[in-house]
Amino acid sequence: PRLSAASFSARRRSSACQMECGILAGFFFTVWSVMSQPLDLNELAHKIKQWGAELGFQKVGITDTDLSASEPKLQAWLDKQYHGEMEWMARHGMMRARPHELLPGTLRVISVRMNYLPANAAFARTLKDPSLGYVSRYALGRDYHKLLRNRLKKLGETIQQHCVSLNFRPFVDSAPILERPIAEKAGLGWTGKHSLILSRDAGSFFFLGELLIDLPLPVDGPVEEGCCRCVACRTISPTGAIVEPYTVDARRCISYLTIELEGAIPEEFRPLIGNRIYGCDDCQLICPWNRYSQLADEEDFSPRKALHAPPLIELFAWSEAWFLKVTEGSAIRRI
């Protein structure tokens, strides 16, 4: 028998309803299955490192939130005014050493590394030619903050698929947190005498990021320190910014003077800056461990032609409009 239009429409609605209910049932069954299965934290930690590698991180480590050992040094550094005009360094006090205050309930911090060294860096040629401007290698490509943060967010969402109750928060220079002590505790490397993290297989030309989570994952241990008696970074600093091993006086650092300092650069430092117009890499370039630096995998970190060894005489002719165009999406926009 033929169906009336009303009957046919009713059957279609019934079929659609059954399909929707089936989808919802499947979803809730999946959630129930995930929640009902005992969580193997060791296996999950292993998978997190695999997922991190798939997302473009060259190294992933896990550590707890106890950074109390770093608090006295941080306070002493602030007391000596080594942070200069970076008042935001002191604004949050010891919160930098207490990740659990940023995300209540935090039990672990996942620390990640992403290489940024471009293949055609041409360090020496640019620095030795006084007619060319030197831009710190990390700033030659697109701003790393958004890229790393998005990847960390994806990592958190992937973990959440296996632990639906997970709370997480990604950080890439976006909150008061001691990323280097975290990276050191997580086994990504050790703190060099220039205060940067060094890795035996990657040197120091890499970015760091953190993912705070509330899972009691097994933690990784620190690696052995490898600087020994080497003081090359202290010796090479044009302005004597590394005032003692592992301690940088930002007020003397060329990176601070050319990026962070809002006023005029003190006269005593001007001739020492040379052709470095944005940042400085000298303490990294001289480091023996950077013979093992790894090149960046990300196309976004490729140097922009206008920023890669620009003739200084041409920079004087840049208009504001051209500057904004050339630095669009670049970390240089922060100055």
Functional labels for PLM-detected ranges:
Residues 8, 27-29:
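Aromatic (phenylalanine/tyrosine) cluster motif
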Residues 35-226, 265, 274:
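Auxiliary alpha/beta "docking" domains used to position bulky ligands
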Residues 57, 232-255, 262, 276-300:
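Iron-sulfur cluster-binding cysteine motifs and their immediate structural context
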Residues 265-335:
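Alpha-helical scaffold domains
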Residues 2, 11-13:
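Basic polycationic patches enriched in arginine
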